[in-house]
Amino acid sequence: MKHIVKHIHFVGIGGAGMSGIAEVLVNLGYAVSGSDLSRNAVTDRLEALGARIAIGHDAANIEGANAVVVSTAVRSDNPEVLAARHQGVPIVQRAVMLAELMRLKQGIAIAGTHGKTTTTSLVASVLAAGGLDPTFVIGGRLISAGANARLGTGDFIVAEADESDASFLNLYPVIEVITNIDADHMDTYGHDFARLKQAFIEFTQRLPFYGSAVVCVDDPNVRQIIPFISKPVVRYGLSPDAQVRAEDIDARDGRMHFTVIREGRAPLAVVLNMPGLHNVQNALAAIAIATDLGVSDDAIQLALAEFNGVGRRFQRYGDVPSADGGQYTLIDDYGHHPVEMAATIAAARGAFPGRRLVLAFQPHRYTRTRDCFDDFVNVLSTVDALVLTEVYAAGEAAIPTASGDALSRALRAVGKVDPVFVATVDDVPDALAKVAQNGDVVITMGAGSIGGVPAKLVQHIQQKA
């Protein structure tokens, strides 16, 4: 590619999926430019690495580019897309560019409705501990690396495979992981769950004959597609028929202690430095891959024990002063689907038994809120106190019956929790100051702008002091 394409421009370069690919390309020696609507830590990092960053979208931004990379979130009438089309510059989907990177190395693609980012991070961390020095492209910041992407010298590239727009069908890895299959992004599949499952089957057909599909058999939908996978399958999970499974699971001190059972291997005692049964499952995927690639048990144990997590995935901010003179534990999480939220809430209950759980939640997308409305009501009813914001639209038109206010009214009707509704994320710090008490565990959650709230909370407390 490099003898033809020397300058690559990214429209929306600050996004999690785009920025990782851009960083790897910068490190490969390409001239990289990009635009976004605002600056963030990611754009600052890319600029420091040598990328040219423009704030705002303008036709002039693509000057000199041999290719323009877009995600499905970029509209066709974006001025940079229009300019590229007018100038005859190839417009490349993000997943297609990721597929090009995978052609340079042996790809390990992590797919599934939930858990992709954490599982990708665990796989990258375990392979790195085993001396394989992988390249990785992750949808969140790997805290130990301080970045969501890295160009390694080894043979493997570990990346998330996105089913939300079916773009994972562009990838041709040698190892695939399927963590679970759940009803999300159903607009892509015509609201037909069978079509979604078929897409995952087609994903496994991208594997070479020597490749393998590493699948979580605890998920009933994954289990249903196994008979249709024509390539070698490695089953992991907590189920008795899993080839890589966890037994004797014990949650202590915010960590998960368990024994790994693998066919033909001695039992392996593991401590995972993060809470939650779902993260045990994610770790098993990493263990299965690492075992297959010859990583030593010592390296596996070390990587999991020292895993520092991923930004916005049960990310701990420590103890924060509360308005009553005490302090509460602050955690931030990216969860935005009821299944993910339930797993995070369960992890918090396990890590902090007996403590009151306060959730500040920003729903993400009106269509998801509409499609999962009852499930949102059920999962939000399980916390002890709730601050709820208006839906983060992510470019969608508002749906009045699926608004944050509508969700709030439905929760009050059920009667298990009385939500404090705020119109904007900017109102969350004040609302939490009134709700949070000494000894509470407070979780800010959502895939939208609520990710900036933890830093504001700390600042809010300092200003009040």
Curated annotation (Swiss-Prot):
The keyword ATP-binding applies. It is found in: Cytoplasm. Keywords: ATP-binding, Cell cycle, Cell division, Cell shape, Cell wall biogenesis/degradation, Cytoplasm, Ligase, Nucleotide-binding, Peptidoglycan synthesis. It catalyses: UDP-N-acetyl-alpha-D-muramate + L-alanine + ATP = UDP-N-acetyl-alpha-D-muramoyl-L-alanine + ADP + phosphate + H(+). Its EC number is 6.3.2.8. Pfam families: Mur_ligase (PF01225), Mur_ligase_C (PF02875), Mur_ligase_M (PF08245). ATP binds at residues 112-118. GO terms for molecular function: ATP binding; UDP-N-acetylmuramate-L-alanine ligase activity. Its main location: cytoplasm. It is an enzyme of class 6 (ligase). Pathway: Cell wall biogenesis; peptidoglycan biosynthesis. GO terms for cellular component: cytoplasm. One of its GO terms (biological process) is peptidoglycan biosynthetic process. PANTHER family: UDP-N-ACETYLMURAMATE--L-ALANINE LIGASE (PTHR43445:SF3), UDP-N-ACETYLMURAMATE--L-ALANINE LIGASE-RELATED (PTHR43445). Cell wall formation. Belongs to the MurCDEF family. This is UDP-N-acetylmuramate--L-alanine ligase. It comes from Burkholderia orbicola (strain MC0-3). The gene is murC.
